[in-house]
Amino acid sequence: MEMTFRWYGKDDPVKLEYIKQIPGMKGIVTAIYDIPVGEVWPLERILELKKEIESHGLKLSVIESVPVHEDIKLGLPTRDRYIDNYIQTIRNLAEAGVDTICYNFMPVFDWTRSDLNYKLEDGSTCLIYDEEQVKKMDPALGELELPGWDTSYGEGGLKGLLEQYKDIDEEILWSNLNYFIQRIMKVADKVRMKMAIHPDDPPWGIFGLPRIITNFDNLKRFIDLYDSPYHGITLCTGSLGCTKVNDMVQMINYFGKERNRIHFAHLRNVKITGDSSFNEVAHLSEAGSLDFYEIVKAYCDYDFAGPYRPDHGRMIWGETGRPGYGLYDRALGAVYINGLIEAIKKNKKN
């Protein structure tokens, strides 16, 4: 297993030199954030990014994400131009030595929360999702804006985009995803690029929009769209684990051990607080609803060799910055995972 860390570029208050100091840290997960969605990532920009990361003794392990343009998700006639651009970006990333791309197919919005600074009993703050609060919100009125969302369309554009999705149900979205996969995977195969779709977060429909990468059956349906070892998933325990329907160990055993299609792992804990509601918490098993020992053991049992990262953390010790992506709690999560891996591996030898 290759430990990696999410980094949001030179404007990220979490610096590469700090990330390098985390025990066992090998790689960086990042992207180029100033290129408009749907445009080609120039090779020279990718090489600049890689050089910056390598100058700190780290590896550019995973690109997360190359965003998928909404015209592709909507299945509009213009989608082929954007898919062509996406394919060229895959080629450029492969030429630069990148071998894994994490992406998602969530309509309009990326990961969604109702509060970015919910105060826990210990005084730390975290991200939470309260279904009742979300139901009262209207994102078209600017009532909710989160890191990672593409807001380039503006308020008027967002209303129009939401209107376009009124005729898109789950099966139409599946059809549009399949079209995209059939196009990009032919090239990904040739350049040996592992394409790892991220589950929808949260794994249910929001604001009347369909979401389809949500559970075991849908992940299996996705994997079966294209027969290639490079067509796979990012298994995010936080996204999938916020509903009791999803069994993380079962998913790791099937999609990892049996199918070998887990190309990237996001490791974080969540505490389920109600139907379709949850808090993000420390990685420790007792802090949330997931058994982190069993999750990490499932990866170790089949010798998962791919990249993983400690995912969202709380804000602790007075740290400020990008919600969910501070240094301190994610570093604690990394060290906790280090300890689990070492103990599990040594126990296997005895």
From Swiss-Prot:
This is Mannonate dehydratase. Pathway: Carbohydrate metabolism; pentose and glucuronate interconversion. One of its GO terms (molecular function) is ferrous iron binding. Belongs to the mannonate dehydratase family. Its cofactor is Fe(2+); Mn(2+). Catalyzes the dehydration of D-mannonate. It catalyses: D-mannonate = 2-dehydro-3-deoxy-D-gluconate + H2O. Coiled coil: none annotated. Its EC number is 4.2.1.8. SUPFAM superfamilies: Xylose isomerase-like. It comes from Clostridium perfringens (strain 13 / Type A). InterPro entries: Man_deHydtase (IPR004628), Xyl_isomerase-like_sf (IPR036237). Keywords: Iron, Lyase, Manganese.
